[in-house]
Amino acid sequence: MAKPLSITSSLPTFSVTWRAYFEMTKPKVVALMLLTVLVGMCLAVPHAVPVQPLLAGMLGIAMMAGSAAALNHLIDRRIDGLMARTYNRPLPKGRISATRALIFAASLGSLGFIVLYSLVNPLTAWLTFASLIGYALVYTAYLKRATSQNIVIGGLAGAMPPLLGWTAVTNEFHGHALLLVIIIFTWTPPHFWALAIHRRAEYAKVDIPMLPVTHGVEFTKTCILLYTVLLAIACLLPVLVGMCGPVYFVCSSLLSTGFIYKAWQLKYRDHDGSAMQVFRFSIYHLMLLFMALLLDHYLWN
């Protein structure tokens, strides 16, 4: 006689499945994005952020960002299976079907939109929806495969989070929030191009026209260096308009100098692993830069 299926025997499968769904939301990327959302919220008000827009805003934006990431997994499942960096993702490995991934992404995005629309404000809900469409459809489904400037153009969607945080609290646009968008928009190309140099052969294999594939590695190194200089200028804009004080100025200057130096090393002192060093440094650069914005806001202002 067959033994009845116990509840405990189904738990491992349940755990593995939900880990796969969680992986599809790109939690590390979303965590860094939420830091920029939080900074946008905090800089929008002189004192403490109201509890409801803080909690509901972070939750709704996180859910819609996770939805966009899941759609990215779904759309890229074929090329992900051919690349060493991504072949072990849930969809290429068959841990989740394409249909279930679509249902998950649609459900998560819809719930996030409802949270933002009903508990925060319609402006933030629609802006977050526009960012989702920009990343998941405009960038992933079209630009990524259409042009070597995919990261430059598509980077606008990924630069929106500080603005989303700002509007979640104030329900309006502000020039200061747009300065934060400009910083992330300028940061995005050197960040991704460094990774693209390291993974150039893989992108070429799947016909993704990343800049190192279409224009060569040396040209891309030059672009990275030039963009880090442009980023350093963009990072000074909050100081020039009186948005930030000396705490941010010092931190920003040090971080920008470090990023430019790493890019210079990549261009003129390249060695195995240099591109990934630039890539990793760029992550710390953005994280520490926005923490400096937060620190300056409460210590100086």
From Swiss-Prot:
Keyword Transmembrane helix assigned: yes
Membrane topology: Multi-pass membrane protein
Stretches that traverse the bilayer: 29-49, 51-71, 101-121, 123-143, 150-170, 177-197, 223-243, 244-264, 275-295
Pfam families (alphabetical): UbiA (PF01040)
PROSITE patterns: UBIA
EC number: 2.5.1.141
Keyword Membrane assigned: yes
Catalytic activity: heme b + (2E,6E)-farnesyl diphosphate + H2O = Fe(II)-heme o + diphosphate
Keywords: Cell inner membrane, Cell membrane, Heme biosynthesis, Membrane, Transferase, Transmembrane, Transmembrane helix
One MF term in the entry's GO annotations: protoheme IX farnesyltransferase activity
Record-linked InterPro entries: Protohaem_IX_farnesylTrfase, UbiA_prenyltransferase, UbiA_prenylTrfase_CS, UbiA_sf
Disulfide bonds: none
Pathways involved: Porphyrin-containing compound metabolism; heme O biosynthesis; heme O from protoheme: step 1/1
Subcellular location: Cell inner membrane
GO CC aspect terms: plasma membrane
Biological process according to GO: heme O biosynthetic process
Top enzyme category: transferase
Domain of life (superkingdom): Bacteria
Function: Converts heme B (protoheme IX) to heme O by substitution of the vinyl group on carbon 2 of heme B porphyrin ring with a hydroxyethyl farnesyl side group.
NCBIfam families: cyoE_ctaB, PRK04375.1-2
Extra remark beyond the main annotation: Carbon 2 of the heme B porphyrin ring is defined according to the Fischer nomenclature.
Recorded family membership: Belongs to the UbiA prenyltransferase family. Protoheme IX farnesyltransferase subfamily.
Listed PANTHER family: 4-HYDROXYBENZOATE SOLANESYLTRANSFERASE, PROTOHEME IX FARNESYLTRANSFERASE, MITOCHONDRIAL
Protein name (record): Protoheme IX farnesyltransferase 1
Species of the source: Shewanella baltica (strain OS185)
